[in-house]
Design a protein with these regions (language model features):
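Alpha-helical transmembrane segments of multi-pass integral membrane proteins
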Residues: 73, 103-225
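Active-site-flanking alpha-helical
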Residues: 19-20, 186, 227-232
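Central hydrophobic cores of alpha-helical transmembrane segments
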Residues: 34-44, 110-111, 162
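A recurrent flexible, glycine/aromatic-enriched loop bordering the glycosyltransferase active site
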Residues: 2-4
């Protein structure tokens, strides 16, 4: 199931790239009055389908199915469309410069707490709910806010340009592909050694994250970059 998650994700990405040109053109060229009703009907249908399943992993299989992952991609394009609009630019500028330092500090803290809440919900919530719409609103808020605070006043605007975070950002794709497998491996090892003792959960998380970063670095250096260079050379011939 862990490996299936990564392979399904790659399938979703390939499927999206094949239709990106047409999907992007449709969303950018049409008005919100056309886009929002169509997308809303699609989202409601997907949510109803997720909550109608009762068997284990059924909601997960539906979640990974490429046509339903189009919802995430559509939301991303819609967010870009809004960000480029006059209203989006005004809101972005207000977030960056139109609030005081204290307001920025509080807002940054709320965003971090939102991420922590989403993490806890992802672990403990019902799969039908988790696979339906858990990440839609939070992802939109997080992406828009992160882009807007590039020159902001809050502590996140000073933390995000950090060299370590920049370095990790270059491996974000590999980290995403590896994290489920690496965390599961470390979890199985610690369960055998320590049982379900929650006092070791913090150490387990640190080891799992370190293992994920290590595997991401190895795969990018010895697989991703060499493969990319070979394909680039073939394409240039």
């Amino acid at each position: 199931a862990v490996l299936n998650g990564s392979t399904w994700f790659l399938s979703d990405i390939i499927f999206f790239y094949l239709i990106f040109k047409y999907l992007y053109r449709f969303i950018i060229r049409n008005s919100w009055r056309t886009i929002l009703p169509i997308l809303s009907i699609y989202m409601i249908g997907y949510i109803l389908l997720c909550f109608s399943t009762t068997k284990d992993y059924s909601a997960g299989y539906i979640y990974f199915y490429p046509p339903f992952r189009l919802i995430d991609f559509c939301l991303g394009i819609c967010l870009y469309k809004f960000y480029q609009s006059t209203k989006g630019q005004k809101l972005s500028e207000k977030i960056a410069k139109g609030i005081s330092c204290w307001q920025a500090f509080i807002t940054d803290t709320i965003i971090v707490l939102m991420i922590a809440t989403m993490y806890e919900l992802a672990i403990h919530s019902n799969p039908n709910f988790r696979c339906a719409a858990l990440y839609w609103l939070s992802s939109i808020i997080l992406v828009f806010y992160t882009v807007s605070i590039e020159n902001g006043k809050g502590w996140l605007s000073y933390l995000l340009p950090n060299k370590i975070l920049f370095w990790l950002g270059n491996y974000s794709f590999e980290i995403y592909l590896w994290h489920m497998l690496c965390f599961r491996i470390i979890q199985s090892i610690t369960l055998r050694i320590y049982g379900e003792d929650i006092s070791y959960s913090g150490i387990q998380f640190i080891i799992s994250l370190s293992f994920t970063i290590l595997m991401s670095w190895i795969s990018k250096k010895y697989i991703v970059i060499p493969t990319y260079n070979k394909l680039k050379n073939i394409a240039c011939k």
